[in-house]
C-alpha cells in the first residue's frame, strides 16, 4: 500500500486556507473518495507526489502538457524570458510569433486575441457574438462546460457534474434566461430552438468533442448540421476548442472534422502549461473588438511573454507526424483498456478522439450527458483508487478524459494496461 501521510497533512492545512482546500473543485478528489495527492514535481510522462510516490500521468495538468512535464525546450524558453522580464504592459514580438502559428494552423482564425484563460476566451467570444449580431440569446449543450462565466454555467458538465450541481448559486435568473440548453448530438432540438427563438439567438457554442462529460465525440452530421442551421439563421457558430485545440489534430477539432466555425476559443495546449487563452475568427468579426472596434475586452497580463514563449515552443514541436504517433499510442491504450474490461466482464464503453480517451463504466453507448450519467460512479471511484495504488494518475472524475503526451512511451502504455488489468480483476 502506498503511503500518503504528507498529502493528507498538507490537505488538512489547506482546508483552513482555501475553499475546500483547493483552488479548483475537482482537485479535492471528492468524487473518488480519497484525499487529493499533492504533487511535488514532474518530468516527461511521470509525476511525483510529496510522499515520494511515482505515477504515469494522464491528467497532464488537465490537458495542456502535450509534451509532458518540464519539456526541455519549454523550460529553456521560460528561463530565457524570465531573465529579460516577465511582463511589460506593452507589446512584444513573441506575441506576433505565437499568433502567426495559431492563424496558420487553425482554419477559422484570421485574427486572434490572446487572453489569460479558457473561461476568459469563451466569455469574450460570447460578448463579441452578441455585439456583432445585436442579439441576446446563446445556445449551448447540456453537459458541455465552457468555463465559469455566468452565461455558460447553465447545465454544465465537468466539476459541476462531479459535484452533482446542475447550476451554480449566484447565477442571476436574468442571465440564465438568455441561455438555451439542448442535448449534445441532438440536431433536431437545435432546429426546434431556432424555430422558437431564432431571431434572438446570437450564437451556438459547442465543444467539437465534449470533454467535460467524459469524452463524447460528435455523431456524424452533427457539427455539419450546426454549421448549416447557424448560417441559415444569421447566428454565429463558436467552437470551444480550449480542450480539443491542438490536442485532437494538427488543425484542431475543426480540422479533424472538417467543419469551420465563425469563432474559435483556445486555451490549454497553446500556453504550454502556463495560464493562457485565446479567441479568434473571421477578420470581419474580430475587427469589432477594441481598439479597432466598439466591443471592449482587455487584460493586464494578456499576451504576457512567459505564456507566449511556452505556447510557441509547445506548438513548434508539434508536426502532422506527431498526431500520427498520438493516434498509434491512443489506439494501443484504448484496445488494452477494452480488453481488460471485457476479460473481467465489466460493463464499459470507451470513446476516443485523437489523444483524448474516456472510459465509462456503463453498457450504454455514451453520446450525450444523460448517457454519461448512466455510468457506475461507485465503480469508477474504486477503480480510480486502485489505479493510484498501481502507480497511474488519472483525472479524479468519471466526467473527464485521459490525455496522452509525446512523452508517453509504449512501456508507459503497457504498464497502464497492466495496472488496469489488476484493478479490474480486484473489482469484478
UniProtKB/Swiss-Prot annotation:
The modification N6-(pyridoxal phosphate)lysine is found at residue 268. Its main location: cytoplasm. Pathway: Porphyrin-containing compound metabolism; protoporphyrin-IX biosynthesis; 5-aminolevulinate from L-glutamyl-tRNA(Glu): step 2/2. GO terms for molecular function: glutamate-1-semialdehyde 2,1-aminomutase activity; pyridoxal phosphate binding; transaminase activity. Its EC number is 5.4.3.8. Keywords: Cytoplasm, Isomerase, Porphyrin biosynthesis, Pyridoxal phosphate. InterPro entries: 4pyrrol_synth_GluAld_NH2Trfase, Aminotrans_3, Aminotrans_3_PPA_site, PyrdxlP-dep_Trfase, PyrdxlP-dep_Trfase_major, PyrdxlP-dep_Trfase_small. It is found in: Cytoplasm. One of its GO terms (biological process) is protoporphyrinogen IX biosynthetic process. Its cofactor is pyridoxal 5'-phosphate. It catalyses: (S)-4-amino-5-oxopentanoate = 5-aminolevulinate. Coiled coil: none annotated. It comes from the Bacteria. The keyword DNA repair does not apply. It is an enzyme of class 5 (isomerase). GO terms for cellular component: cytoplasm. Belongs to the class-III pyridoxal-phosphate-dependent aminotransferase family. HemL subfamily. Homodimer. This is Glutamate-1-semialdehyde 2,1-aminomutase 1. It comes from Bacillus cereus (strain G9842).
